Amino acid sequence: DQPRSRGLGDVYKRQEQDGNQPFLMCCHFKATHEPYDYPIRMEHLYDGVTFPEPENLLDWGPETNGRSFKGQTLEELERRWRIASQDPDKWWCRYPGLPFSTEGMQRTAARRASYQKFIRDYLRCGATVDDNIGKLLNALDEMNIADNTIVIYVSDQGYFLGEHGFFDKRMFYEESARMPFVIRYPKKVPAGKRLDDLILNVDFAPTLAEFAGVKMENVQGDSFVSNLEGNTPTDWRKEIYYRYWTNHAIRPAHFAIRSDRYKLIFYYARNLDMTDTENFDFTPSWDFYDLQNDPHENHNAYNDPKYAPVIKQMKKDLLRLRKETGDTDEKYPEMQELLEKYYNK
C-alpha cells in the first residue's frame, strides 16, 4: 500500500503545480517477494479455497524429468517456515500464517500442503498489488490524463508457483525466465494485443525513449515500439542469451540460449570469483527442451538423437551470442577448459 500512496501523492502534487508538464513515476511493489506478507485486510481472502495444482507439482527432480539439478523446491520453503515457527528471531524475515509444519506427512501430501499455503499467501499479495494498481489507474482517470499517459506493469523476472515443485526464480525455465510486461497507451498500442516476439529487459529503455521522442545511441537493447504497433522488423532477434552466475547445489551456475521453439542450457557449476556461492560436486551438463512438444519442460531431451542437428546448431548460436554480448569468460581459463571438454558431451 505504501508505494501506491506515496506515488499518488507525488503525481497529484505535480499536476497541481503544472498539469501540462510531463512526469515519470516509478512505483515499486515488492509484495509478491518472499516472505509473501500481505496486509491484514487480505488475511481471509481465499479462505477455504483449494487451488488447482500445476501438472508437474510432483516433479521430484532428475529422477522425474532427467534435468541436471535438484532445484529450489517447496520442501526448502517449508523448512524455512518450520524454523521461523519455532523461533521467529532466528530467521531473516517474518512469514504470515505461522506456525506451519508438514511433520508426519508423506512426501506427496507434504508438498501439496506446502503448495496450498504458498500459493494462498502469494495470491493475497498479488491481490494487494492489483488493488493498488487499480487505484493508480483510477487516479489517472480522475486527472483526465489517462489517454496521454504510458502505463507499464513489469517485473524483474518470472516466478515459480509450484511448477516442478519449485518456488522462487533464477533458473532458465519458462516460469522464471518469462517476465510480465503489460503496457497501456491508447494513442499507440492496440488494446488486447499479445506480443510473441523475443523481448529483453535491455529493450525497455530504448522503447520508452522512442515513445518520449528521445533518440538513444550506443545502447544494448532495441526499441520494440514497432512490434507493439504490429510491425515487427524482419531482422528482429531470433534467439536470446541468458546467464545465472550464483552457484549452489540446488541451482548451479549456467548460461543458455532460447529460440521461439527450443532451449539449450549448460550448467557449468563453478564459483569463479562470485560471492554467495558454495562448493559441491557436480559434473557439467546440458539440458535441452522442445517448447512446442514439451511446453512445461517435463522432459530433458538432450540425449534424444532426433534433436542432435538442432542441438549442434544451437551450440554454435550460443557461442555466437556469448561473443556478441562480450560474455566469453576470457579471464577464466577454467571455463575455457570446461567448454572444450563438455562441448560435445
Identify the residue ranges that each predicted region occupies:
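Single conserved hydrophobic/aromatic residue that forms the stacking wall/gate
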Residues: 1-12
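Active-site-proximal cap/lid insertion segments
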Residues: 14-21, 26-199, 210-219, 273-275, ...
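C-terminal cap/loop subdomain of S1 sulfatases and analogous C-terminal strand-loop tails that border
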Residues: 22, 157-163, 202-205, 210-287, ...
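A generic structural signal for nonpolar/aromatic side chains embedded in well-ordered alpha-helices
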Residues: 27, 46, 227-228, 257, ...
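Short amphipathic alpha-helical coiled-coil/interface segments
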Residues: 314-318
